[in-house]
Design a protein with these regions (language model features):
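Extracellular beta-sheet repeat scaffolds used for adhesion and glycan interaction
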Residues: 86-93
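Fibrous stalk/shaft segments of extracellular and virion attachment machinery
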Residues: 1-33
Length: 117
């Protein structure tokens, strides 16, 4: 079975086209990336980290307000969330995700940095 998700913004004109379907919804929980080694996230990345050893996921450099990154630790190893110069929850330190933990991080401003929802 194949399911295609389309956002309302793509259908604002009321028409469904193959180009709109190919563009995807661009919304939450779409196009997850599976990572087993260190990776620098891009804005809107939705990552599942699956590793038995420690892995570092580095947040995007020079983020803008509203940028979002989702990270899920599906492995046994600890995931370090590298702040890449931005604060995380107003703190100038990296974060960690234990096994089976997840975080949705939204960039607010240079003081708060990425805020965990």
């Amino acid at each position: 079975m194949s399911v295609t998700q389309v956002s309302n913004s793509l259908l604002a004109d009321g028409s469904v086209t193959s180009a709109k379907l190919a563009a995807g919804a661009g919304g939450a929980f779409n196009n997850f990336l599976i990572k087993t080694t260190a990776y620098t996230a891009a804005t809107r990345d939705q990552l599942i980290v699956n590793s038995s050893s420690a892995v570092t996921i580095t947040l995007p450099a020079s983020p803008s307000a509203g940028n979002v990154v989702f990270i899920k630790n599906a492995g046994a190893g600890v995931v370090t969330v590298g702040r890449n110069g931005s604060n995380i929850n107003s703190q100038a330190q990296d974060g960690t995700l234990a096994a089976d933990a997840s975080a949705t991080l939204v960039f607010v401003d240079s003081t708060i940095g990425f805020k965990e929802l």
